[in-house]
């Protein structure tokens, strides 16, 4: 299904996200004919560029990063325009009014406008207000939609204040809070796996599942983002948004119908059902860590405190592990172990469903565990692990697997997260975007962790290239469980 005809306005068009993700995503949608010809892209930033220079910059980016060439590239670039605007100056937004009118008339886009805030978070409230002051939020001529990047607030209080500020000019149905994790194919397939297969849904509860672990690991450090990262840390950067949303999709009830409101209702219910964290929880079920120098992929790397832009006495966490529970009928008593960190041995995001063992071990006390591994990135796919008889005498069981990889689908075109989410926003499908009640529930849940950090909670060192502090292993071992050590999901076909 194609996107609706519209003008896409990218605020922060001279920034890294526009070059790396947004323009390549729009180009690829154009290449597979999901945009058609009746669209335009207006880049907006303070940098003094014109249409020609902006097109050339984007053209070189697409050649370098996407291997773009030929007529398709030139035609796409002809849809790109630029307007220099001081985004902090309300009066300067007057320049956008005639420019957008001209583009809507040229491309017959009927006033439909998608605003993308690829800017520092300090402008998330300013830009909607400035658009509203010039009437660029009104839907009297076509729809107006606003995509807001993370972080949506710094804590519960600032998130609620930002909502109030944006809602003065844009209604909730116009606001699309983007989380690129939810645009990944495997996350979406999790819902199909659960709700369309009779194998899984009857087992997806406390009666059959022992525990669930969710891992969001990165092998890189903070790179050139030391100053930004030090103000957020692993909890704000990954856990509060990405991983809590993934947890909610693992645990949610079946929606009544597949539409944005029903899906997001169920996500919000899960977040509201998370057992509130007590002081005892944050002291005994939470591990915060910070990497020190070590070896990653055979290369010696510096510690966090040595990174550019990081204060020498920073107590910002680069690792977090938490045991949490959901207080409802389906999940009562099932622990969810969630961890994320930088400078770990591999870049991998996965969900592991650990099923309970048989009531009585007929063949062996050490029979292989039944588990379902859902790999979100990289090497997206699903693997079922279970026990079968080892060839030879006796009845010794060994672990075997049944594996599926998206890369093995002949002719499959798997959209990137930004391609999928941009297309959905242009179609008016908010299913994979966070709603305000879910955002507030997530911030409410993590507030005790923020308080613990502010009070100087314990921070463990871990060597770069390891799977985090040994305290995280002890956390899960207290209940006789272990973290999976992610490696290749499965062997690739040759």
Swiss-Prot record:
Gene Ontology biological process terms from the UniProt entry: glucose metabolic process; pentose-phosphate shunt, oxidative branch
Binding annotation for NADP(+): 46, 150
Cross-referenced InterPro entries: G6P_DH, G6P_DH_AS, G6P_DH_C, G6P_DH_NAD-bd, NAD(P)-bd_dom_sf
Catalyses which reaction(s): D-glucose 6-phosphate + NADP(+) = 6-phospho-D-glucono-1,5-lactone + NADPH + H(+)
A single GO molecular function term of this UniProt record: glucose-6-phosphate dehydrogenase activity
Gene this protein is translated from: zwf
Species of origin: Aggregatibacter actinomycetemcomitans (Actinobacillus actinomycetemcomitans)
Protein name: Glucose-6-phosphate 1-dehydrogenase
Family per record: Belongs to the glucose-6-phosphate dehydrogenase family.
Keywords from the UniProt entry: Carbohydrate metabolism, Glucose metabolism, NADP, Oxidoreductase
Annotated disulfide bonds: none
Broad class of enzyme this protein falls into: oxidoreductase
Active site (UniProt): 242
Pathway(s) per entry: Carbohydrate degradation; pentose phosphate pathway; D-ribulose 5-phosphate from D-glucose 6-phosphate (oxidative stage): step 1/3
